[in-house]
């Protein structure tokens, strides 16, 4: 509404029903039949919105997109979510949440992105018994690989902010819910 151009990126993986993901995209004016990997698709509803199907682990694809778009700011909400799934599929979490996040940080660094906001997780609090949770609580003992990957994101972002002067803000989300939320989450 403020005239900003927005580019959405998603791998549209099958962690849960892809029809839910395509349904969300349809509401933004992006039709499934128009989506091709790494190609920008213009919304038919919003002049300032386009979508790219892209894996964050695809360093070349991320680099090309950042060079082409010259993003002023990045809001990275992408990650392989789910604590239970991380127990049986650890490589997926390392690839998406660590390597993918590194690719975003590097693209921000080399393309002079002015601000990065990213999703961390309440899972970083682990077995902390102090309530309410606080950013001042110790989060050095994750109890799942998912939590460890999100804590790693926080440490990586801190380093890039310090070393390369990229302003970063991490958001420790709790369960996101609603009619378009993940079907494996409780309401």
Where are these regions (language model features)?
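Substrate-binding strand-loop-helix patch
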Residues: 179-187
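N-terminal Rossmann-like NAD(P)+-binding domain of SDR-like oxidoreductases, especially those catalyzing
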Residues: 1-176
């Amino acid at each position: 509404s403020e005239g900003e151009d927005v580019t959405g990126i998603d791998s549209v993986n099958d962690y849960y029903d892809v029809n839910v993901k395509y349904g969300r995209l349809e509401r933004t004016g992006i039709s499934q039949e128009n989506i091709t990997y790494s190609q920008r698709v213009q919304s038919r509803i919003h002049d300032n919105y386009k979508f790219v199907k892209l894996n964050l682990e695809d360093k070349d694809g991320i680099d090309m997109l950042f060079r082409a778009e010259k993003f002023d700011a990045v809001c990275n909400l992408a990650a392989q979510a789910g604590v239970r799934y991380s127990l049986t599929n650890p490589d997926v979490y390392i690839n998406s949440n660590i390597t993918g996040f590194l690719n975003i940080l590097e693209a921000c660094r080399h393309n002079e992105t002015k601000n990065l906001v990213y999703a961390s997780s309440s899972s970083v609090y682990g077995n902390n018994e102090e309530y309410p949770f606080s950013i001042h609580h110790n989060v050095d003992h994750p109890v799942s690989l998912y939590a460890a990957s999100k804590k790693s994101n926080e440490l990586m972002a801190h380093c890039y902010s310090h070393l390369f002067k990229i302003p970063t803000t991490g958001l420790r989300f709790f369960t996101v819910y609603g009619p378009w939320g993940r079907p494996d989450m409780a309401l």
